[in-house]
């Protein structure tokens, strides 16, 4: 079974907001330290940023409004923990996310993915579709 999530699903929107905040950090600093968590839904966006770069609430709201539309923004910013900053001071850094290229799919799963893309093109709204090939 595979799960395909629409591009307008709150999880995908949250990923784009987090990415935009990371981009902003790199505009402000050539070597920022930043970790961002975003939870979005029901007209609210909650953001926690652990970073060496300072963001204004206005900058964050502008990003959220541009990507997700007008909604209430709850933003918390904290400095990176000292032991993490010291651990990441050299060339080698750590993080909890890697680069995801995908997983091998069977021919049936590829066909189902194509169906999901057609559905997303026709209905570009929040939604989740689980394709298990049973129907």
Model-derived features: where do they sit?
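A domain-level signal for the structural core that forms small-molecule/cofactor-binding pockets
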Residues: 1-135
């Amino acid at each position: 079974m595979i799960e395909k999530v629409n591009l307008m699903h709150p999880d995908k929107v949250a990923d784009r907001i987090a990415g935009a905040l990371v981009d902003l950090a790199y505009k402000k600093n050539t070597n920022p330290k930043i970790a961002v968590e975003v939870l979005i839904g029901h007209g609210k966006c909650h953001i926690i940023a652990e970073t060496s770069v300072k963001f204004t609430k206005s900058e964050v709201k502008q990003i959220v409004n541009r990507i997700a539309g007008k909604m209430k923004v709850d933003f918390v910013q904290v400095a990176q923990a000292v032991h993490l900053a010291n651990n990441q001071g050299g060339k080698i850094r750590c993080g909890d996310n890697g680069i995801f290229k995908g997983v091998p799919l069977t021919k049936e799963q590829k066909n189902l993915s194509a169906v999901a893309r057609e559905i997303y093109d026709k209905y570009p709204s929040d939604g989740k579709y689980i394709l298990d090939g049973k129907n």
